Regions:
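Bacterial N-terminal signal peptides
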Residues: 42-51
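Sec/Tat signal peptide C-region and signal peptidase I cleavage site
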Residues: 53-59
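Catalytic cores and adjacent binding grooves of peptidoglycan-active enzymes
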Residues: 60-62, 175, 179-380, 384-388
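Extended, low-complexity, intrinsically disordered C-terminal regulatory tails
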Residues: 62-75, 121-152, 222-244
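Active-site acidic/histidine clusters and adjacent loop/turn architecture
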Residues: 75-140, 201-211, 215-218
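Extracellular/periplasmic catalytic domains that process cell-envelope and extracellular macromolecules
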Residues: 130-132, 156-161, 213-214, 248-251
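Acidic/His-rich structured neighborhood in mature extracellular/periplasmic domains
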Residues: 131, 144-198, 257
Length: 388
């Protein structure tokens, strides 16, 4: 194979040199320059062959374009592959655009997909937070249908285990699609002082973050450093949950929930554990020095997503990218962790216990839905698009 490749390149070099010489057949070249010319021709030919060899790599499609073009998840057992900022996931499900205590924002982005555990947790948080006095969740970006690098925005959110929740409570009216696309979020942090705007902060914000941190699945909650400081300054009594709340750039209008690698995802790369303590120490004080806010010395440096090709991602992500579509988005929308993800065609009503059992889930009452209490069951798997 190697010899054949070398012979091919040699033949290409000879053809190039012959064609290049033909351009100068009618030009009289002084004798001292002829030897130099032969060397120059050979050099040009080698460079041309090298350029041709490098061209496929340079022209390889960016992974963000490939994953960003997918409108539906890959039908498979739920599995996160790679790291939060370099990976993909299969078997994703969508959170419904509307729930009893949540609404999805910016729906045109098609980023309401995640690992079933992530989606179930968001729905659970919406119910628990409502019991704590939070009117309802405005759900931001979760992941693309198959994860992977995004066309815009996040570096992470690639393996279905990250989700953004706005720090603006859900209004007491249903938002139109236009409002969800254009409604501005409330910025809670002053960009000059990096401190929370006291007039906008309420104890309900603290309760919401504490509730999110209370779940065993949650490993990190990313917030603006100003919000972390506000919590450090005001939380009394139990402060153990503050360990999960980590300061990071941005996150001034939403918080970022990150859950750990889930069972059935052997190729998922876990993040390091958070440091012991409540995080209200020198590591937080650093955020209120000049260093974190200095201008970027190389603002034109490409972002990772603008360089990542499929070769940059775990090899298993190619199979995820090529995996079969489900019948529809509705067929893989997660209506509460008590209702199976629809199997095959679109469901117009909750499945009967017999159908639920046939799909691999435990038997459920036919009336179970996102508006009812949800029993603990296994996660059923969606089936491929019929005929596909």
């Amino acid at each position: 194979m190697l010899k054949r490749s070398l012979r091919g390149k040699s033949l290409l070099l000879k053809r190039f040199a012959t064609r290049f010489r033909s351009l100068f057949t009618h030009v009289v070249v002084p004798k001292p320059l002829r030897t130099f010319g032969r060397h120059a021709l050979a050099t040009l030919a080698v460079l041309a062959v090298a350029g041709l060899a490098a061209r496929p790599a340079a022209a390889e499609e960016l992974a963000k374009n490939l994953f960003g073009a997918k409108q539906l998840p890959a039908v498979a057992a739920p599995q996160s592959i790679g790291f939060y900022s370099k990976g993909c996931f299969a078997g994703g499900v969508a959170i419904p655009l509307n729930g009893p205590k949540w609404e999805v924002m910016r729906p045109s982005r098609n980023r309401r997909w995640g690992h079933p555990t992530m989606i179930a947790l968001i729905e659970k948080l919406s119910r628990d937070a409502a019991a704590d006095g939070w009117p309802g969740l405005l759900v931001g970006d979760i992941s693309q249908p198959r994860g992977g690098p995004m066309l815009t925005g996040h570096a992470s959110h690639q393996i279905g285990l990250d989700a953004d929740i706005w720090l603006t409570p859900m209004p007491d009216r249903k938002l139109s699609l236009e409002q969800r696309e254009n409604m501005s979020a409330t910025l809670l942090v002053d960009e000059k002082t990096h401190l929370v705007k006291d007039a906008l902060w309420a104890p309900a914000h603290t309760r919401l973050l504490k509730r999110a941190a209370s779940y065993a699945e949650v490993e990190r909650i990313l917030v603006n450093p100003g919000i972390k400081k506000k919590l450090c300054d005001t939380v009394k009594g139990d402060r153990g949950w503050l360990r999960k709340v980590r300061p990071f750039w941005g996150h001034d209008y939403h918080f970022h929930i990150r859950i750990g690698c889930q069972p059935g995802s052997p190729k998922c790369k876990a993040q390091e554990n958070t440091a012991p303590g409540d995080g209200c120490d020198q590591s937080l004080a650093w955020w209120f020095t000049e260093e974190p806010w200095r201008p970027n010395k190389n603002p034109d440096r490409p972002k990772a997503r603008d360089l990542m090709t499929m070769a940059s991602l775990p090899a298993a992500c190619q199979a995820v990218l090529d995996g079969p579509d489900p019948a529809s988005a509705e067929a893989v929308t997660y209506y509460g962790d008590g209702v199976p993800v629809a199997a095959a065609p679109v469901l117009t009503k909750a499945p009967s216990p017999a159908r639920a059992s046939a799909s691999g889930a435990a038997a459920l009452p036919a009336t179970a839905n996102a508006y009812a209490e949800t029993p603990e069951i296994g996660i059923p798997l969606p089936r491929p698009r019929p005929g596909g």
